[in-house]
Amino acid sequence: MNIGIIGLGDMGCIYAKSFLKAGYRVYGCDLPHRRELLETELGPYGIEILKDGKEVSQISDVIFYSVEAERIAEVVSQYGPYTKKGAIVAGQTSVKHPEIEAFEKYLPKDSHIITCHSLHGPGFDPKGQKMIVIPHRTTKEAYQRMTDILSSLGSILNEIADYHEHDKIVADTQAVTHMGFESMGTAWKEAGFFPWENASYLGGIDNVKILITLRIFSYKAHIYGGLAILNPYAKQQIKRYAESESELFKLMIKEEADTFRKRLYNARDFIFGQNHKPLMLNEKVMQEFSLSAGSENRKPNSHLSLLSMVDAWYHLGINPYDNLICQTPPFRLRLGIAEYLFKNEDLLEESIETALFDKTIRGDDLEFHSAVREWSSIIGYGDMEGYKQHFEQVKTFFAGRLEHGRDQSAELIRKLEIE
């Protein structure tokens, strides 16, 4: 059985090594100028680097396209027509609309389209990680063959029958989640301080916010840009998040306490009042992973980013627990800290009182409000280049701590047993 991987970036390389380890012959390719480097890096493992996707497509029984979502149509149009007769073809992008459209347009009619989505980043081995499998155009026999191949990696497979449903869920679990953390990063950059040096960001919830923000900015902008801009369901959900944040912020400024409190308690009852198995994040563990070197006492925080998320879920009629089938560590952590906040009435009341009446945090909330509007506008306009530039500016601001933050967040994820 020959496995082919078109696109040997971070994820492509991880899967090439994993399939080889599982006993398959692996062929791969990338851009021409990277061939020599990849031969040096992957050749010793026994992975054969071919000239281009045409050669990979002609020799492989199962082909994975591991390229940016914004380039999937271009790449499939070049190499899809050369797909081996009866081969299985999959994509590794996180948004399936452009991928399926390209496969249907350029692949031979006898090819099987069984696409997938790995719910982890390049910092994790596929073993034990969740993977979504979507049988779009296939037979029972080919689907069994594909699931056997993917299971050999040790991944935990979950099937979603329809790619539209996948993209709806991922709009919440990834696009809106990432945009929330990106807005925090932008707000801290514009305010000109590192949050771990500020007493308002020393609690367990804030440790998680900081580490996941650093984790996201330690990766590549195109990963998140494609998720947000190319997913047709993401814009609606991101727009609702921005509206929730703006409406809550206006109530805070006007100190309309009764309306503000009632709105959040209604959202709490809708999301957390049902009989779900709680995620139960551990405060002791969250406190361990602080980047702060000092011993200042924690100041109350409005947690506007979390209030806005829960309010947006409520207005969209989304139950985030239903979306755990497509969970990623940042989404599960975000839902976990929202649950931790909203199911602790004393902490929720502290957050509400701080949001309404504590002027010392209002400047930070204003920066967050501006950042949410900026990110929402960029995504709404479909401005991929603007997205990347905005992302890189924040990445530069945090450059000295990104690697450490990613390592810490990976350890936090492992310790909270949410891989």
Q: Locations of the language-model features?
A:
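Rossmann-fold NAD(P) dinucleotide-binding segment
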Residues: 54-106
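Active-site-proximal catalytic alpha-helix in oxidoreductases
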Residues: 166-222, 300-314, 371
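Interdomain hinge/lid region at the active-site interface
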Residues: 197-294, 354-374
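NAD(P)+-binding Rossmann beta1-loop-alpha1 motif at the extreme N-terminus of oxidoreductases
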Residues: 1-48, 55
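Short, well-ordered alpha-helix to beta-strand connector turns
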Residues: 23, 46, 60, 86, ...
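C-terminal non-catalytic accessory extensions
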Residues: 264-419
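Rossmann-fold dinucleotide-binding core
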Residues: 96, 103-171
